[in-house]
């Protein structure tokens, strides 16, 4: 974590940060051990989003009733010291929902050893597109837990949801140029 914090504060983009953290981890990590993560940097005013992935599940973007995966790939950290990471840049639209999750959600198994899977997750996001972030997170986690039932979850399940405001909201201190009534 210390390496990650130090590198993330240097202001490099997500891809370069992952490459630098990966090189450091490859020197310190046990053979066969690895770390997955997704690094996202958002400019809240412009809704510009830069993403880089180190073996993490693909993020989901819900926009205008459709859910699509943001295709971004990279090796998990700690596997290959000269691994390179790509950066994907996108602009979020007003009302978009970005869902980040660990494989503990989609790889939840029921008693018949069937995966919860990506299709169920996408359907869940579509069905709850009007939810604010916290209830959507709770719904996804509760549904994955319920799917596992008595089998229990074998892996950690984490969900992060980012929802953009449906319309532009002025930033604090922004002054409107509209004339004042006299």
Regions found by a protein language model. Give the residues of each.
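Conserved subregion of the PPM/PP2C metallophosphatase catalytic domain
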Residues: 1-182
């Amino acid at each position: 974590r210390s390496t990650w914090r130090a590198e993330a504060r240097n202001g490099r983009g997500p891809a370069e940060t992952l490459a630098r953290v990966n090189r450091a981890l490859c020197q310190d990590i046990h053979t066969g051990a690895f770390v997955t993560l997704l690094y996202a940097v958002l400019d809240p005013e412009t809704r510009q989003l830069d993403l880089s992935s180190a073996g993490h599940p693909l993020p989901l973007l819900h926009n205008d009733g459709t859910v699509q995966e943001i295709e971004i790939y990279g090796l998990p950290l700690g596997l290959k010291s000269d691994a390179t990471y790509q950066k994907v840049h996108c602009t979020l639209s007003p009302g978009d929902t970005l869902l980040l999750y660990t494989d503990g959600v989609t790889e939840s198994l029921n008693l018949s050893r069937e995966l919860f899977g990506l299709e169920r997750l996408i359907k869940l996001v579509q069905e709850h597109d009007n939810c604010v972030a916290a209830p959507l997170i709770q719904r996804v986690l509760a549904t994955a837990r319920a799917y596992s039932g008595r089998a229990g979850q074998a892996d950690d399940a984490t969900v992060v949801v980012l929802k953009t405001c449906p319309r532009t909201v002025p930033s604090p201190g922004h002054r409107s140029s509209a004339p004042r009534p006299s």
